[in-house]
């Protein structure tokens, strides 16, 4: 597995924060690094396989990656990321107690993926741009300024996370997308889902199309197909079983949609003919 080292990304040995844009981020094989990072998805879509579990990421997704986590990117489509790298929560010169603002693992579950709405994403970009402008300066005031900006970033993300901000339709749509990530195999009635998340059906369609570039049903189908592709690569279950587990009631229909989406059949993927990056 590829290991990325801090010496290749941080501007100096005492720098606590570094900015690494990926505009765009291409498919990248599984790797880990000797530093932590906050991945901010600017726009586009892709699959982020995090410790073996696939997540669909779109504009507004924020991923918290620790130094022992392994992850990869696949099926990227104009996926643009900004990575905010930091050595460790306890390796800051002027800050302490940062762990309290970061996601915490509880009973083996780590909430690695958050979502923020468009207005918050704009504020995030401004903070990151300020950090980036100061990267070449190593005097104490500049170091303190970068660390303060990093603290502001964590506070903004914390306050704006789904757990704490559901007061507008953009935030409710983000919650709906997170719900689909966990319930993709269920039979989805869009009228009921819209009501569940206090959205009109028209607003749901419009905002989901704006955020993902896809209609709701197209987004759900792609999500199911991507989950199925992951299982084809990483499990021994039969194609039929995987189709059912991913919400398809007809394995033949599943195979047709799968080939249309990926230009490979499920059997091709199972046999590794697509040259997937391991």
From Swiss-Prot:
GO terms for biological process: positive regulation of DNA-templated transcription; rhamnose metabolic process. InterPro entries: AraC-bd, AraC_XylS_family_regulators, Homeodomain-like_sf, HTH-like, HTH_AraC, HTH_AraC-typ_CS, RhaR_RhaS-like_N, RmlC-like_jellyroll. Gene3D superfamilies: Homeodomain-like, Jelly Rolls. Residues 191-212, 239-262 bind DNA. Signal peptide: none annotated. It comes from the Bacteria. It holds the Pfam family HTH_18. The record marks 241, 250 as: Interaction with sigma-70. Keywords: Activator, Cytoplasm, DNA-binding, Repeat, Rhamnose metabolism, Transcription, Transcription regulation. GO terms for cellular component: cytoplasm. Disulfide bonds: none annotated. It is found in: Cytoplasm. SMART domains: HTH_ARAC (SM00342). GO terms for molecular function: DNA-binding transcription factor activity; sequence-specific DNA binding. Residues 174-272 form the HTH araC/xylS-type domain. Its main location: cytoplasm. Activates expression of the rhaBAD and rhaT operons. Binds DNA as a dimer. This is HTH-type transcriptional activator RhaS. The lineage of its organism: Bacteria, Pseudomonadati, Pseudomonadota, Gammaproteobacteria, Enterobacterales.
């Amino acid at each position: 597995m590829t290991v990325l080292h801090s010496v290749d990304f941080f501007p100096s040995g005492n720098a606590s924060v570094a900015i690494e844009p990926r505009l765009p981020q291409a498919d990248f094989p599984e790797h880990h690094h000797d530093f932590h990072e906050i991945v901010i998805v600017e726009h586009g879509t892709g699959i982020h396989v995090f410790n073996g579990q696939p997540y669909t990421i779109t504009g507004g997704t924020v991923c918290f990656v620790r130094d022992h986590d392994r992850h990869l990117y696949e099926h990227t489509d104009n996926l643009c990321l900004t990575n905010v790298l930091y050595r460790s929560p306890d390796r800051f010169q002027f800050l302490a107690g940062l762990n309290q603002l970061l996601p915490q693992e509880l009973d083996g579950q780590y909430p690695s993926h958050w979502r923020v709405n468009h207005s918050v994403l704009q504020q995030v970009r401004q903070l990151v741009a300020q950090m980036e402008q100061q990267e070449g300066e190593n005097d104490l005031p500049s170091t303190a300024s970068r660390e303060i900006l990093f603290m502001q970033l964590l506070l903004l993300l914390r306050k704006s996370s789904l757990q704490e901000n559901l007061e507008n339709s953009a935030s409710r749509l983000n919650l709906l997308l997170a719900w689909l990530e966990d319930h993709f195999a269920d039979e989805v009635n869009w009228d009921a889902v819209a009501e569940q998340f206090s959205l009109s059906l028209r607003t749901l369609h419009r905002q989901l199309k704006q955020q993902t570039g896809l209609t709701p049903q197209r987004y759900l189908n792609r999500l199911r197909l991507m989950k199925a592709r992951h299982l084809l690569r990483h499990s021994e279950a039969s194609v039929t079983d995987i189709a059912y587990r991913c919400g398809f009631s007809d394995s033949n229909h599943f195979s047709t949609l799968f080939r249309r989406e990926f230009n490979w059949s499920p059997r091709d993927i199972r046999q590794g003919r697509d040259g997937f990056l391991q």
